[in-house]
Curated annotation (Swiss-Prot):
Record family assignment: Belongs to the methyltransferase superfamily. MnmM family.
UniProt cross-references to Pfam families, sorted A to Z: rRNA_methylase (PF06962)
Pathway stated in the Swiss-Prot or TrEMBL entry: tRNA modification
The name this protein goes by in its record: tRNA (mnm(5)s(2)U34)-methyltransferase, chloroplastic
Enzyme Commission numbers on file: 2.1.1.61
UniProt keywords, alphabetically: Chloroplast, Methyltransferase, Plastid, S-adenosyl-L-methionine, Transferase, Transit peptide, tRNA processing
Catalytically driven reaction(s): 5-aminomethyl-2-thiouridine(34) in tRNA + S-adenosyl-L-methionine = 5-methylaminomethyl-2-thiouridine(34) in tRNA + S-adenosyl-L-homocysteine + H(+)
Keyword flag Iron: no
GO MF, one example: methyltransferase activity
Length: 260
C-alpha cells in the first residue's frame, strides 16, 4: 500500500528525503540527476519516465516504512540506490561482507547492452570468498563478468577503481562481518580515509551510502567520525542526510551523502 500523500509531504518538508527526491512525478521535468542524458563511459543515466517515477515512489515508500518500523535501514538504503543508479553505471561496494549489497548493486547496473561495473572490496579474504561463492550461485555468467573483487582495505579503493570510470555509488557497511570474527571490525582511522577517497571518485549526481552498526565496542566512535566527515562537506557541492532510530540506541544509523 503506498504511503498517504500527507505522509510524503511531511517527510519532504522536514528534510527526511534527499533533495533530488522532493518532487512528485507529476510536478514537471525531473531534476538534473534524473534527467535522461547521453551515455558517458562508466556512467549511463538514461531511464524512462516510468522508471524515474517508480524510483521516487519506491524511496518514499521505504522512508515511510522505516519511520513506521516496517522497513530496515538496509532496505531504505537500497531504495535510494535504485533511484540514483542506472544500467551501465560503475559502483563500489567498499565492504563486501557476505555479498548482499554487491548482489543488489550488480542487479542495478547489469545490462546486456551496456557494461556496468561493480568493484567489491573487503579486507578479509573470507568475506571476498563468501561474496564470490554467493554471486556464482545467484547470477549468470554475463553478470558475473561485471564484478571485480579485491582483498584490500576500503581506504585504498582509489588503487583498484579506474580513474576514467565515473562512479555513481560508493556504499559502506561499517562494523564486523556477519557470522565472522566480531573482533575484526572497521575502524575510525581507515574509515575516514575511505570516505575521503569515496568523495574523490564519486561523480556529480552520485551518492556515498554509509550504514554504521553501533552495537559493538568502537561502533559509536566510528559513527562520530562519519558524522564529522559528513558535517564538514561543503554545502555548495554536497547534501548530507541521516536516518536514525532515536529510541533504539543500538540500531544501525544510515548516512547518505549526495554529490550535486
Amino acid at each position: 500500500m503506498p504511503p498517504p500523500p500527507h505522509a510524503a509531504f511531511l517527510l519532504r518538508s522536514r528534510g527526511l528525503l534527499p533533495p533530488l527526491l522532493r518532487r512528485s512525478p507529476s510536478s514537471g521535468p525531473p531534476p538534473p540527476l534524473l534527467r535522461p542524458t547521453r551515455q558517458r563511459r562508466g556512467l549511463s543515466v538514461r531511464a524512462s519516465a516510468a522508471e524515474l517515477a517508480a524510483g521516487v515512489a519506491g524511496v518514499e515508500d521505504a522512508v515511510v516504512g522505516f519511520v513506521t518500523g516496517k522497513r530496515k535501514a538496509t532496505e531504505l538504503a537500497h531504495a535510494v540506490w535504485r533511484s540514483i543508479v542506472r544500467k551501465g553505471d560503475t559502483v563500489v561496494d567498499a565492504t563486501c561482507g557476505n555479498g548482499n549489497d554487491t548482489f543488489a548493486m550488480l542487479k542495478m547496473v547489469a545490462d546486456e547492452r551496456v557494461q556496468g561495473r561493480v568493484y567489491g572490496l573487503d579486507i578479509q579474504e573470507s568475506a571476498i570468498a563468501s561474496t564470490s561463492s554467493f554471486l556464482k550461485m545467484a547470477v549468470n555468467s554475463h553478470e558475473l563478468e561485471l564484478v571485480k573483487l579485491f582483498t584490500i582495505c576500503h581506504s585504498r579503493m582509489e588503487e583498484v577503481v579506474p580513474k576514467d570510470f565515473p562512479v555513481r555509488l560508493v556504499a559502506f557497511n561499517l562494523g564486523y562481518l556477519p557470522g565472522g570474527d566480531k573482533t575484526i571490525i572497521t575502524v575510525p582511522k581507515t574509515t575516514e580515509l575511505a570516505l575521503q577517497a569515496a568523495s574523490s571518485i564519486v561523480s556529480s549526481g552520485g551518492l556515498i551510502s554509509v550504514l554504521v552498526y553501533i552495537g559493538h565496542p568502537g561502533g559509536r566512535d566510528e559513527l562520530d567520525v562519519v558524522e564529522s566527515f559528513a558535517s564538514s562537506l561543503p554545502i555548495d557541492t554536497w547534501m548530507s542526510c541521516k536516518f536514525e532510530m532515536l529510541n533504539r540506541p543500538a540500531a544501525p544509523v544510515l548516512i547518505l551523502l549526495y554529490k550535486k
